[in-house]
């Protein structure tokens, strides 16, 4: 072991592969971003060129970051995702992504009453994909494609596998459920515990570690582990988790185990994240949200592709309410960021959990107007994580576990660090509070 040892974490995201090399203190020694196209062939479809995003992107990231001191590598990725592959592990169908209508589950409205993410989306992905490529060698989510390209091991972690329920039943691939989709279990990827070594990265002496779901990787290095800590993940998807000591169910929200022993987290994923904000950027002219008049901002309902928690209504669509001639691009941009902040506040309040602090992580933390809007909408300071590539950093820590450089996932807490604290603005407090009430009423929230 050398003080110069580094591990690499690769995060397959919605719009790019982000990767970092990190030392034993979690200091990023190198980083790279490999962009890829997000295809929207129809309003209710969302897909990748899986070969570009899931195979070539991670290989390019490895090529840019690997060095003689690289001890291990792990991959994080969004869920759910799925493609069919040929005998060489190359994708041969579109890479289907979360929220795509091809994963629409019949009678999915029951998800409103569930306290875990709705099940069956990946099964519907598999049914469609198997119909397109019935003779494929495998049906793999993004991390399996990447891991095979990197090491020849088509492997995913248990957390990713569990999101495919009922295909994976907690102990293995369910032959009946897979057969119902036209697939045999031997064409599904191997499943292992995150943070264990399963192979060697091609052309190197580095260990391939099993990674995890992107949100889980972000969580382990965010330091939001105490009761009342709220973790806001600002990526293409907005994810809000409040740490609680005892699991409980709230209609419309998800409750899942925390990585910290004895803790749970309540909240969920929303479409009021980067996909919505990037769309606003494309259709609205230039304007600095910081220069908007606090009293002259409309209200967005940010549902350009439906909403997940707490509404679970994929057919909802966006609304811009209260627009008048006194407003400009800056006002409309501020309204978009506020909409994201309002969703954060709504998910926190619906949970009924006490709040100690808010920690923001993810690539969106680089966007100061977004962070300011979350602070203003919640009325609380926002602690912004130092490393924006949180999922990649968390994956790098899992690499350290596999390489024997760490002994416990709890040790990842020392990698958590704060870049800055964004305080709510007194000038915006009153108008933002009033717009939040309008947002709740317009969206039909139970809090209205």
Language model region names:
Residues 67-98, 118-120, 143, 147-168, ...:
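Short beta-strand-loop/turn "lid" adjacent to the catalytic site in phosphate-handling enzymes
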Residues 30-34, 189, 321, 420:
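Structural signal for short hydrophobic segments within the conserved structured cores
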Residues 8-9, 104, 108-155, 165-180, ...:
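Active-site core segments that coordinate phosphate-bearing ligands/cofactors
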Residues 49, 100, 214:
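Short, conserved phosphate/pyrophosphate- and ester-handling motifs at nucleotide-, phospho-/glycolipid
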Residues 34-35, 98, 245:
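A generic structural motif
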Residues 1-93, 204-210, 375-382, 448:
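N-terminal glycine/serine-rich phosphate-binding loop of ATP-dependent small-molecule kinases
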Residues 180-187:
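A structural motif corresponding to the C-terminal end of an alpha-helix
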């Amino acid at each position: 072991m050398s003080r110069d040892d580094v591990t690499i974490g690769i995060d397959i995201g919605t719009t790019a592969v982000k990767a970092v090399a990190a030392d034993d203190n979690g200091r990023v020694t190198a980083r790279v971003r490999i962009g890829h196209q997000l295809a929207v062939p129809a309003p209710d479809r969302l897909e990748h060129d899986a070969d570009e995003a899931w195979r070539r992107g991670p290989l390019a990231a490895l090529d840019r970051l690997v060095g003689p001191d690289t001890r291990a590598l792990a991959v994080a990725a969004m869920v759910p995702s799925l493609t069919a592959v040929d005998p060489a592990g190359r994708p041969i169908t579109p890479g289907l992504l979360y929220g795509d209508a091809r994963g629409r589950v019949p009678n999915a409205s029951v998800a409103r009453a569930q306290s875990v993410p709705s099940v069956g989306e990946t099964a519907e992905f598999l049914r469609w994909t198997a119909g397109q490529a019935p003779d494929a060698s495998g049906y793999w989510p993004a991390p399996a494609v990447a891991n095979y390209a990197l090491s020849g091991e088509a492997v995913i972690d248990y957390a990713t596998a569990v999101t495919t329920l009922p295909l994976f039943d907690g102990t293995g691939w369910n032959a009946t459920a897979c057969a119902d989709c036209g697939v045999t279990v031997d064409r599904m990827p191997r499943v292992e515990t995150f943070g264990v070594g399963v192979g060697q990265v091609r052309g190197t002496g580095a260990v391939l570690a099993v990674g995890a779901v992107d949100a889980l990787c972000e969580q382990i290095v965010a330091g939001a582990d105490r009761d009342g800590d709220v973790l806001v993940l600002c990526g293409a998807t907005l994810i809000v988790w409040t740490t609680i000591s005892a699991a409980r169910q709230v209609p419309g929200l998800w409750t899942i185990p925390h990585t910290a022993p004895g803790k749970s987290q309540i909240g969920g994923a929303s479409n009021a994240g980067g996909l919505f904000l990037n769309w606003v950027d494309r259709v609205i002219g230039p304007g600095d949200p910081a220069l908007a008049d606090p009293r002259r901002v409309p209200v967005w309902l940010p549902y350009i592709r439906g909403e997940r928690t707490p509404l679970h209504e994929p057919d909802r669509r966006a609304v811009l309410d209260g627009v008048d001639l006194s407003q400009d691009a800056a006002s409309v941009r501020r309204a978009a960021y506020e909409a994201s902040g309002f969703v954060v506040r709504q998910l926190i309040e619906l949970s009924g959990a006490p709040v100690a602090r808010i920690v923001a992580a993810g690539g969106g933390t680089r966007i100061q107007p977004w962070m300011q809007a979350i602070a203003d909408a919640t009325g609380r300071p926002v602690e912004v994580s130092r490393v924006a590539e949180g999922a990649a950093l968390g994956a790098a820590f899992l690499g350290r576990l596999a390489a024997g450089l760490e002994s416990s996932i709890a040790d990842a807490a020392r990698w958590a660090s704060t870049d800055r604290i964004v305080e709510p603005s007194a000038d915006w407090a009153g108008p933002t509070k009033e717009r939040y009430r309008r947002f709740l009423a317009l969206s039909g929230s139970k809090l209205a």
